[in-house]
């Protein structure tokens, strides 16, 4: 697993 990019709402 790797840090997923944070997607704004």
Swiss-Prot record:
Q: Name one GO molecular function term.
A: peptidase inhibitor activity
GO BP terms: namely: regulation of blood pressure
Q: Does the keyword Secreted apply?
A: yes
**Positions of modified residues (Pyrrolidone carboxylic acid):** 1
- Record's keyword terms, sorted: Hypotensive agent, Metalloenzyme inhibitor, Metalloprotease inhibitor, Protease inhibitor, Pyrrolidone carboxylic acid, Secreted, Toxin
Cellular component per GO? extracellular region
UniProt superkingdom: Eukaryota
Q: Where in the cell is it found?
A: Secreted
Q: Any keyword Hydrolase? A: no
> What is the tissue localization of expression for this protein?
Expressed by the venom gland.
Function recorded in the entry: This peptide inhibits the activity of the angiotensin-converting enzyme (ACE) by a preferential interaction with its C-domain. May also potentiate the hypotensive effects of bradykinin.
Q: Record's family? A: Belongs to the bradykinin-potentiating peptide family.
The entry's protein name is Bradykinin-potentiating peptide 9a
